[in-house]
């Protein structure tokens, strides 16, 4: 019983500490870019989706940009991530590429946009999702841009 009360007290303390930040980010756009499950286990990826849904439920406007692992159909991966968000309790819509009007419409209809970078031909050219996330953050005047990576700090290819 003591452990149960300690757990509740801990959760209450965390929530109290978070309240000022929650207020600061209500109705603010946050773009989150991550490498789809390539370095996250299924359990960790589901926790990430729950965290994104939590952000939305407290009034933050998340936009998700993802990378598709090699050999995986990018449209199928996009649908998978949108479905994961829906299973966590929110509406999500898979979108290809960057179109500000579509993003605004998606957000205004209470959906989380889930974006896969898309080349013009839909096939050949690799587009870095970090570049797409940055482009979206700028065009949507996002308040935060978050890159989730397996690398600590900022990774640069020194080769």
Sequence positions of predicted segments:
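N-terminal glycine-/serine-/threonine-rich phosphate-binding loop
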Residues: 1-63
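Catalytic-site beta-strand/loop segments enriched in glycine and acidic/polar residues
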Residues: 29-33, 106-131
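Charged helix-capping and loop-helix junction motifs
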Residues: 45-50, 126-133
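Alpha-helix C-terminal capping segments
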Residues: 54-58, 87, 135-143
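Ligand-binding beta-strand-loop-alpha-helix segment within the catalytic cores
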Residues: 71-119
């Amino acid at each position: 019983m003591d452990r149960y009360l300690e757990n509740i007290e801990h959760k209450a303390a965390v929530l109290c500490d978070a309240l000022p930040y929650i207020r600061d980010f209500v109705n603010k756009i946050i773009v989150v870019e991550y490498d789809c499950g390539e370095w996250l286990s299924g359990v960790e990826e589901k926790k990430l989706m729950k965290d994104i849904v939590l952000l939305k439920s407290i009034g933050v406007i998340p936009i998700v940009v993802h990378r598709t692992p090699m050999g995986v159909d990018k449209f199928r991966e996009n649908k998978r991530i949108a479905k994961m968000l829906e299973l966590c309790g929110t509406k999500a819509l898979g979108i290809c590429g960057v179109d500000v009007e579509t993003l605004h419409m998606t957000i205004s209809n209470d959906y989380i946009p889930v974006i896969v970078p898309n080349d013009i031909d839909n096939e050949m050219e690799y587009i870095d999702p970090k570049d797409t996330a940055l482009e979206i953050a700028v065009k949507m005047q996002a308040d935060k841009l978050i890159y989730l990576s397996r690398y600590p700090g900022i990774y640069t290819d020194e080769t």
